[in-house]
Amino acid sequence: MNFVNNLFTLKKISIKNISFFRSIIRIETFNNSFCDSLGNFIKRVIFLTTNSYKIIYLKIYKIKSEFYDLPGIIENTQTILKNLDNIIIKINNDNVANLIIKKKGPCIITAKDIFSDKNITIFNPNKIIANVSNNIVFYCIMKCVNSLFKNYTDEFFQFKIFKENIIFLNNFKSPIISLNYYINKKIFNKKLKKLFFDIETNGSIKPVDCFKNCIFYIKKYFDLIFSFIGFKKYKKINVEKKNNLNLKINSVYLNSINNLKLSIRSLNCLKNNNIFLIGDLIKISKNNLINIPNLGKKSYNEILNSLKNFGLNLNSKIEYDL
């Protein structure tokens, strides 16, 4: 099996940080449909490989279940659970952490009142959890885990420390607020395209890190496939000349046909047949050019004269793809 060296080559990846929560990543250049296929693939993998941190179960003293309200607290228990669920938290350099809140009222309990046995970061510390109106103690112990450990169970926490009245929070939320990709065509060659990713997160992970994690996992999977098929053993097709001389691209070939200063009728006829560059035009034979629909002899002669001014002729051979 043979593989062409430059079927498509990526030349540049650039990142523009709009804010701490949003970044735009540009990848170029692509040919044909590679751009759309790769964009959809990377978008799906980013969602799969981006993890978050979540409180999975907790114990609030003197509360028997989520339907039992604690006297002296303005909010009901279900509202408190919603507030805890909306806290954006990250465990640094670990996957599991114990969290605790212990505060005596009257007071306002916020996310910054949470303490842990691990190094944690809370991105919305002013998030209100509950309002304590009476002179009581609000005491809550929680277990926070990485979303990769969805089926995590702590038997010591559940069955030895607290044998009952444990409240479970099962829904994991993705830290990605929005993720879109779009394609932009180059002006001088419509066959070449740029791929853009617009990533916005809640702050618990940087948008660039979402993209890096995605590429890391893709590489790990495909490294195994390449080693299995013995990719390096296949013979590659050399696109260069047999004498190994470097091909010099004439810059005129990459210019738009608008530079030929043709009439509007001639330009429209060429563009309707997907001829946008001078290099595309000179590869056509005289018979094929004159047979273009709606292109008369006057336009035909006009094109020949314009090409002669550039020292070019029809039916020219180009050893490389534009």
UniProtKB/Swiss-Prot annotation:
Pfam families: RNA_pol_A_bac, RNA_pol_A_CTD, RNA_pol_L. Residues 1-229 are annotated as: Alpha N-terminal domain (alpha-NTD). InterPro entries: DNA-dir_RNA_pol_insert, DNA-dir_RNA_pol_RpoA/D/Rpb3, RBP11-like, RNAP_asu_C, RNApol_insert_sf. GO terms for cellular component: cytoplasm; DNA-directed RNA polymerase complex. One of its GO terms (molecular function) is DNA binding. Its EC number is 2.7.7.6. It is an enzyme of class 2 (transferase). Keywords: DNA-directed RNA polymerase, Nucleotidyltransferase, Transcription, Transferase. It catalyses: RNA(n) + a ribonucleoside 5'-triphosphate = RNA(n+1) + diphosphate. Belongs to the RNA polymerase alpha chain family. Homodimer. The RNAP catalytic core consists of 2 alpha, 1 beta, 1 beta' and 1 omega subunit. When a sigma factor is associated with the core the holoenzyme is formed, which can initiate transcription. DNA-dependent RNA polymerase catalyzes the transcription of DNA into RNA using the four ribonucleoside triphosphates as substrates. The N-terminal domain is essential for RNAP assembly and basal transcription, whereas the C-terminal domain is involved in interaction with transcriptional regulators and with upstream promoter elements. This is DNA-directed RNA polymerase subunit alpha.
